Amino acid sequence: MPQNEYIEESIRKHGRRFDHEERKRKKAAREAHDASLYAQKTRGIKAKLYQEKRRKEKIQMKKTIKQHEERNATQRGSDAQTQGAVPTYLLDREQESQAKMLSSAVKQKRKEKAAKYSVPLPQVRGVAEEEMFKVIRTGKSKKNSWKRMITKATFVGDGFTRRPVKYERFIRPMALRQKKANVTHKELGVTMQLPIIGVKKNPQSPTYTQLGVLTKGTVIEVNVSELGLVTSGGKVVWGKYAQITNNPELDGCVNALLLT
């Protein structure tokens, strides 16, 4: 037996106090008063955090109460049947029970969709243009300043060809270009180095997505054919999305979590 389970063993051997249930009930009844007293006495940042916590609890409580009310609501359809036959012009009207079922199904689908497209990092720090781009001065007397060099890691495809130097506005240094990512599969618990296919979405800006900038929170598409994943139809999965969880420009590599 583990050394820290002596209380559980004592309960199994000797049982609980004779007034255990009564003490438990009274303690639960006092919780509201204790919470009220704590809310009145607390000051500063602790008070703000506590009020925010209570607000979330109340919102959740209201949602739960609403769900119970919907479940326990009387159904008009059953009342109409008990009162008598339904008129002809009301036969095509949906019963409340059916409407409730449809509503529940729609809510469940929304929850599943939200879970499907949820990402490990829902919020990331914003990156300023000054941090993202470095101004490159050109011209004989270095007066032109319309060129920008990207200071973050980037991805460019195999078929990428640079524009002529005179017309190239955004410069992506070779040292910061990444072609592979260390992708972790959460369910399998393995990490593999997979080739990057493309950049799906950069949370900072659509321009950064177009330029293939890899920052923390960026959703990329990786080649997962090596993992041997198959669809329900038996076809091999070629590409899947993954979200970058580190700062590639600081670490020198791309670490990502596969979105399942």
Curated annotation (Swiss-Prot):
- Chief location: nucleus
Transmembrane feature ranges: none
Q: Keywords, A to Z?
A: Nucleus, Phosphoprotein, Ribonucleoprotein, Ribosome biogenesis, rRNA processing
Subcellular localization(s) per the UniProt record:
Nucleus, Nucleolus
Pfam families assigned: Ribosomal_S8e (PF01201)
Q: Where is the composition biased (Basic residues)?
A: 13-28
GO BP, sorted A to Z? assembly of large subunit precursor of preribosome; maturation of 5.8S rRNA; maturation of LSU-rRNA
Role according to the record: Involved in the biogenesis of the 60S ribosomal subunit. May play a part in the quality control of pre-60S particles.
Family per similarity comment = Belongs to the eukaryotic ribosomal protein eS8 family. Ribosome biogenesis protein NSA2 subfamily.
Report what the protein is called.
Answer: Ribosome biogenesis protein nsa2
